[in-house]
């Protein structure tokens, strides 16, 4: 009878109350139980008050209660009905797995994005290369055009130089013609063939055999302008004797030395082309004119320029490998 009453009384008590009563009967404190079970005192207190901590999984809570029951000598079978109420097993929340098709779509989208990125990169590189090639081709065409123009100008200058030489020879012959009548009237012993010879060479031979009196007449009869025309074999008078002084060096002189073949065009302030054409390696130019000078240089790296005794900086044209267009002012300040 007493056993049944005790059993009914134990069933009326909760799991926490039974564990607390058993601990008190053994004379153990909550601190001692916590140390033996390696738990916190707050966890032991929650178990005795039938509280389930929110941050503690039900599986761990059931294990703690069973360990506590073995410590205070309570059979686990008597606590199972209470455990089902106090710490029911809760299904673990498992995150739903993403569909394989979703991952496949994302991978496909990333592939399209990468393809578009590479396509844009290739287009940018292609446009940059096309722009560089067009600029390089335009420079080469410009250099070729300038070289052709300079060749045409040189050919025109050579074709025009022939009439100029003919007129100069004619002027020299006309300048020597008035001396023939004087020679004829001065001496009656001279032969007719000698009086009609027009060439300066025959005149010089006649002057070699004319008597001194006739030579004086020739000298007096020769006009002043004819005296300035000298035959090819005559030696020029010294500058001191002629009263002519050597001119001073031009401060605006432009000196250029070439280390490689280079096309060049130089124009002064009056628009006169001082030079236009191709200069070969190891060549040099010394030009004078009215400043400022305008220069076009096909290969800036192949020429060294000195203006007013100072070198001209062409490094910015050499770095970009472009045709140099610059103006040299009187203050020796090259401008683009």
UniProtKB/Swiss-Prot annotation:
Biased composition (Low complexity): 165-201, 219-236
Protein name in UniProt: Cytoskeleton protein RodZ
Side Cytoplasmic, residues: 1-111
Stretches with biased composition (Polar residues): 148-164, 202-217
Stated role: Cytoskeletal protein that is involved in cell-shape control through regulation of the length of the long axis.
Gene3D superfamilies assigned: lambda repressor-like DNA-binding domains
Protein species of origin: Escherichia coli (strain SMS-3-5 / SECEC)
Location of the protein in the cell: Cell inner membrane
Membrane topology classification: Single-pass type II membrane protein
Residue stretches making up the HTH cro/C1-type domain: 19-71
Molecular function GO terms recorded: DNA binding
Span list, region Disordered: 148-248
Portion annotated as DNA-binding: 30-49
Keyword field: Cell inner membrane, Cell membrane, Cell shape, DNA-binding, Membrane, Signal-anchor, Transmembrane, Transmembrane helix
An example Gene Ontology biological process: regulation of cell shape
HAMAP family cross-referenced by the UniProt entry: RodZ
Transmembrane stretches, start-end: 112-132
GO cellular component: a single term: plasma membrane
Tree of life domain: Bacteria
CDD domains per the UniProt record, alphabetical: HTH_XRE
Entry similarity comment: Belongs to the RodZ family.
Alphabetized NCBIfam families for the sequence: PRK10856.1
Residues on Periplasmic side: 133-336
Record Pfam families: HTH_25, RodZ_C
Free-text comment about domains: The helix-turn-helix (HTH) motif in the cytoplasmic domain of the N-terminus is involved in the formation of spirals to maintain the rigid rod shape. As this protein is anchored in the cytoplasmic membrane, the HTH motif may contribute to protein-protein interactions to form the RodZ helix, which is localized beneath the cytoplasmic membrane. The C-terminal domain may be critical for determination of the rod shape by probably interacting with enzymes required for synthesis of the peptidoglycan layer, including PBPs in the periplasm.
């Amino acid at each position: 009878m007493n056993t049944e009453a005790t059993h009914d009384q134990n069933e009326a008590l909760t799991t926490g109350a039974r564990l607390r009563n058993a601990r008190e009967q053994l004379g153990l404190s909550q601190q001692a139980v916590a140390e033996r079970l390696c738990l916190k005192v707050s966890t032991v207190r929650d178990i005795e008050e039938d509280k389930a901590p929110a941050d503690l999984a039900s599986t761990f809570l059931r294990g703690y209660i069973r360990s506590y029951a073995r410590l205070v000598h309570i059979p686990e079978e008597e606590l199972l009905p209470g455990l089902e109420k106090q710490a029911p097993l809760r299904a673990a929340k498992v995150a739903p797995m993403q569909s394989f098709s979703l991952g496949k779509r994302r991978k496909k989208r990333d592939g399209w994005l990468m393809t578009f990125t590479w396509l844009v990169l290739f287009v940018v590189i292609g446009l940059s290369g096309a722009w560089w090639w067009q600029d390089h081709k335009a420079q080469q065409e410009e250099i070729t055009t300038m070289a052709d123009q300079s060749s045409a100008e040189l050919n025109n200058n050579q074709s025009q130089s022939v009439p100029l030489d003919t007129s100069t020879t004619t002027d020299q012959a006309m300048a020597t013609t008035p001396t023939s009548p004087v020679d004829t009237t001065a001496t009656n012993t001279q032969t007719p063939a000698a009086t009609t010879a027009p060439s300066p060479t025959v005149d010089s031979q006649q002057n070699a055999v004319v008597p001194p009196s006739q030579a004086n007449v020739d000298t007096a009869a020769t006009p002043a302008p004819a005296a300035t025309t000298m035959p090819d074999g005559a030696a020029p008078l010294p500058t001191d004797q002629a009263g002519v002084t050597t001119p001073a060096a031009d401060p605006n002189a432009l000196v250029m030395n070439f280390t490689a073949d280079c096309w060049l065009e130089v124009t002064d302030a009056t628009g006169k082309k001082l030079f236009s054409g191709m200069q070969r390696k190891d060549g040099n130019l010394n030009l004078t004119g009215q400043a400022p000078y305008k220069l076009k240089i096909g290969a800036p790296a192949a020429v060294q320029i000195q203006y007013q005794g100072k070198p001209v900086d062409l490094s910015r044209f050499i770095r970009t490998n472009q045709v140099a267009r610059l103006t040299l002012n009187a203050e020796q300040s090259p401008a683009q």
